[in-house]
Amino acid sequence: MDYTPEFQLREATESDRTYLRRLNYLADVFGNEEGDVGHSEREGAEAYVGQWDPERESGIVAFDQFHVPAGGVWLRYWQSPDDGYANLAPNIPEIAIAVENRYAGNRLAVRLLQAAVELAKRQGAPKVALWVDPDNDRARHRYEKFGFANVEGEDDVMVVDVEDFTA
């Protein structure tokens, strides 16, 4: 039976931490659930999800019409310059995003990205940043369409002013 999923979005809470771990895994293996996660990715999971503060940083989780988790995005405001992969400043959140493979092609990632930028704007952030593999031309092209630009000297970091984001 074919169906077009309908998504509901809500702010992430502490109870979503386990699901965010799954999404972090999907992001680390670029959606390939048979992919191996290296040592640095395992350590990164603690920083990106284990130390995530839902009250201060928040995020968005998406569900389909049957209340099945479909994807999510979460913000990390890094305090130390050595933390994170796309850490530009303490007031610029790095966003992490992933969508379950079965929901690919339904523009859910666009809705999540838009919701994350709106959330960051409400929190007073001037910009949002993200890490994207320099060889992932498809993703980089998509982010550029939304207004993201490469950060000079950081070939794997992109940033957009929250006022310039276009979905």
Each predicted region: which residue ranges?
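Conserved beta-strand in the GNAT
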Residues: 61, 68-77
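Helix-loop element at the rim of GNAT/NAT acetyltransferase active sites that forms part
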Residues: 22-39, 51
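A short, internal acetyl-CoA/4′-phosphopantetheine-binding micro-motif in the GNAT/acyltransferase core
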Residues: 63, 94-105
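A short, polar/charged loop-to-alpha-helix boundary motif
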Residues: 79-88
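C-terminal "cap" of GNAT-fold acetyltransferases
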Residues: 89-93, 126-140, 144-167
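Conserved N-terminal entry element of GNAT/NAT acetyltransferase domains
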Residues: 1-18, 164-167
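Active-site rim helix/loop that mediates acceptor-substrate recognition in acyltransferases
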Residues: 36-65
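Conserved acetyl-CoA-binding loop-helix of GNAT-fold acetyltransferases
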Residues: 105-122, 141-145
